[in-house]
């Protein structure tokens, strides 16, 4: 393979070679666009749109459009794109991932493909990792788009509904992955189409694409309402977990799982008074126990989470920041609260959910950019159909990457790191020190204080100062300790006299599970041809080496008889570290693939429900759909009641009539003798005929317009109620499905099969409820739509979107008669689910 690459070049090099003629065309137009006035450049937008309307493709106008953006960029923000930046822009337009090193100007690169694709009028989303970067990038690049007559907006967390609608209606919209995803879910929960904020999802350019599409892929977006379950059992299960001894359970650090062994199971049966712990009827107890074990023996305080003011806060494993407002799902957060002795919050009920994998796959075209993507190319290709093109740097990289230094113990390693920082500080050379956890950054900070080294520590709390601190990290004599990805998206520029000292020194205190995260830390130095250096310090006590490192390496170190403060550097050690990282990356990829397998089941179901919901919202005439629904329901009911066994036929007919009376048939209007001698098809026709007559009567009773709105009101309410219950049921199924492996069933296949059966059942119940309500409807006031659930929150931040008021007529009181005509009070009928 290496010989092939030497002769023919790598895949990226060959693809860049193919792109070069387009870059040459853009370059050739440079003098021509320089001669145009600002107004003439602005008019180019209208010209391009006309050409697209006449059938030209985006690819055919690309050279001119890119040349225009390049010139306008120079005139408005003083930045002219290099040839390498144009290559990156073309790669993005082609729906691929551009790997561009830190400092190569990715924010500017996105402007040309965003402009070109915005000409279609279908909108472009530019996705960043946080609100600060979204606003900064929008404010920085807006002059370019506005000079060309395009509108550019930004979505920020605390925006109102009308502000969001305005931002999404712009040609180009900046925002974060979570805001875009939650708006999509919320749009599919609205009850009036005017409340929707997003347009159809057209083209997304994802900045820091590896962070969003890979690191965040295991965290689904969840909108939830308050659940009904008691929290007391979390405390009971926690008491059980704490009573166990080491020999009662087994921790699998590779799989991040913990399970009871035989002695632990016996103790569980005694503790919970069970005959057989493994019985399916004990599934709920098993769930509480598993989460309590995970909370106590896997989740670590100040690494995975922090406790602050009586609240458990998640710490992002990649950025080291506290994620206020976000909670672990599936009861794990409650289990940690029980472990830490703080108030156990009620478990929430999932109302809407989607993974980033499935959200971003909705876009017609997806692309991205990052400094590090190549190590995950297989995953990008497999999950998203994206290939990674490494874009050459504008200037050669002058950073020197030294081999890893390996110590026997963490104590010896940190002493060596502190000594190295001290020597670097004395020399005046700036140092950026990357740590993997809050605990480690605080340990190192204490060591530096004792040595009298002034330094900045960045961990856990994201604030706008973070970008300033990181940007200052290249100044003379500065020492900055930060989690590996802190301040991502901010360039570190070297201060006066730093080049002569060797540039910014990067010190990694531990190898991360992913090579990509290590490469990101390294990439903070050596920006745009600047000098720099990097080195990682590793100990055999580090999690990576302890869990995934080879026994052979441990044996060699033992034989060498290394002391704590002695280090080794060797190719074999470096290879062992890289192999350990590859193992973890493969493991994590498998986990994400499995999660996607599960999510694809509910994703197909979600698409069907959201499409049906959208048709209802758009005000389509549902009369024919309702008629089909009635026929389909009646056919199903008759087929399920009549088995074809002659001796049971009479009894089945009686039960069928009783069931039909419960759904819509007026009592005693159909007698047993009326249908006992009819064929199955004739029985169906008779019941369909009764239903149509009742429906025709309703059409006469109300105006046709009223009847169409009644259909929409009822269908929306029924679909929302049933879908939310179904999501919850699917969550329970997923939780329990792992036990199928003990029955020689493949869990993912069992989930797919049973999930499909549950979906069919939900569709049947939607038809049943809709027909039932429609047949009994009696209106005393104009039909009005109401949300099924009113108080909802997201799993990322407390949901503070300000809703634009929509005028409503007076709502139905809880104790009023239900407008569906059942004769019951509203709170005991349709209002039961509100």
From Swiss-Prot:
It is a peripheral membrane protein. Its EC number is 7.4.2.8. It catalyses: ATP + H2O + cellular proteinSide 1 = ADP + phosphate + cellular proteinSide 2. Keywords: ATP-binding, Cell membrane, Cytoplasm, Membrane, Metal-binding, Nucleotide-binding, Protein transport, Translocase, Translocation, Transport, Zinc. ATP binds at residues 85, 103-107, 491. Signal peptide: none annotated. It is found in: Cell membrane; Cytoplasm. GO terms for cellular component: cell envelope Sec protein transport complex; cytosol; plasma membrane. Zn(2+) binds at residues 818, 820, 829-830. One of its GO terms (biological process) is intracellular protein transmembrane transport. May bind 1 zinc ion per subunit. SUPFAM superfamilies: Helical scaffold and wing domains of SecA, P-loop containing nucleoside triphosphate hydrolases, Pre-protein crosslinking domain of SecA. GO terms for molecular function: ATP binding; metal ion binding; protein-exporting ATPase activity. Monomer and homodimer. Part of the essential Sec protein translocation apparatus which comprises SecA, SecYEG and auxiliary proteins SecDF. Other proteins may also be involved. The keyword DNA repair does not apply. Belongs to the SecA family. Its main location: membrane. Pfam families: P-loop_SecA, SEC-C, SecA_DEAD, SecA_PP_bind, SecA_SW. This is Protein translocase subunit SecA. Part of the Sec protein translocase complex. Interacts with the SecYEG preprotein conducting channel. Has a central role in coupling the hydrolysis of ATP to the transfer of proteins into and across the cell membrane, serving as an ATP-driven molecular motor driving the stepwise translocation of polypeptide chains across the membrane. Its cofactor is Zn(2+).
